[in-house]
Amino acid sequence: MILAFSGCVDQSASDSTSEDATPKVLKIFHAGSLAVPFGEYETLYENEYTNVDVQRESAGSVACVRKITELNKTAEILASADYTLIPSMMMPDYADWYVMVAKNEIVIAYTENSQYYDEITSDNWYEIFQRDGVKYGFSSPNDDPCGYRSQMVVQLAEEAYGDSTIYDNLMLGNTNFEVNENADGTYCIVSPESIDVNEAKVFMRSKEVDLLGPLETGAYDYLFIYKSVANQHGLSYIELPEDINLGDYQNADEYAKASIFLTGQNKTIVAKPIVYGMTVPSNAEDYEEGVNFVKTVLEHPEVFENAGQPVISPAIAVGDVPEEISDLVVMG
């Protein structure tokens, strides 16, 4: 290892069935990996509440939160691919509660245009990545949880595969990331405010959904991506061992051996199982409509399941949860 330091609420709360009223706007800021299920939830909700216009903005989860906390934008729903962003970045000033609704894992996606696609396995992917001409992609750790989780997966791979050069060869040698080894044997990746990559080896974009088209057209070979997104887009992929893929609750202690420091945000994030979280921001223009949308999501977990994302059932809630959804969650 090279070390460097540096269902519906009462209609009084959701008066959305009046055909004569001006349509309400229900704004959603959500993680890019939630585009497919939230597209389905949008259709479901608008069909039930015909006077509501659901408007979604997809971005990296960190960017979604910062729209509210730094750019003074408002939304009725904030849905993050990393539930911990809500308590760490929004509470108590911008949120009072959140629910954990679904989970995921990191896989490596590819196409038939990918070099050595017929050779890559869960055991040799990091060796394939080091071959001449092979190019791999991930989203920006500064903008997107999928991006910093991809870094964590590669760091955790060193112990899992018994090779202390994996992160060095794949990341340190091709980016300006750094790594600190702590006294307790854990590792902290340092993501600089401005990330530079060796474009001959690495393909990086702000969020994971921006990487899909270029992968499919052969701009690069392999992509660290959520399993649900790979399924939704019909991509081939290899699964990674449970002790590094961030998809297994029972490996939480193992995952915690890796962390990342986001320099531009002065924030350290410790690796943990991938869990999606939702809240209604405190400054939502129509708070009750937001709560009603969350209620609809909780009442229709099949939408997540059909999108390849295992649900957490019942959903786990933290904080001052609205009474309208209290019967649909367990308190965490």
Swiss-Prot record:
Disulfide bonds: none annotated. GO terms for biological process: molybdate ion transport. Coiled coil: none annotated. InterPro entries: ABC_trnspt_W-bd_WtpA, ModA/WtpA. One of its GO terms (molecular function) is molybdate ion binding. Belongs to the bacterial solute-binding protein 1 family. WtpA subfamily. NCBIfam families: PRK04168.1 (NF003196), tungstate_WtpA (TIGR03730). This is Uncharacterized solute-binding protein MMP1652.
